[in-house]
């Protein structure tokens, strides 16, 4: 069985989402992130690639850079650029690119499921990159960016996704960085939350 749980997401207010949104940290280098974040103090790059707040050439793995990530994460929350939800939810996230849309559930995953093979590895990753992101998670006590998993076709989950995606989303915008459409819904009804948890619990791996 796969163990998942809802969580209190920390996310931007609707009116700030386009300013906060960024591309994944691993699709661009420090200088590209520095350029995309130029003039935008609300860009998530200040958290996921905090070396941009230091002089060019600063070692991105220096302890002070990780400390800056934590400092910026706290600053974003203090200023209301990132706000934690009051209750635990699941979320639905859709990406639209080249005329095609893919939907996913945003959930809290159970790390031991990854370690014991319930969650299957789908790619070979570099150890240095893994260490970097683990340090980032530890210093922030938060996973700032999602990790994508796949799961088998499931009619119950499909129905829940269809139910929410037929409603007005919390966010719906085209990101300036990648030109992709990003749409986001909040799964906040107790029955739906319980159903999602139960369906994943039925999955052997």
PLM region descriptions:
Residues 1-204:
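A cross-family signal for N-terminal binding/gating loops and helix N-caps
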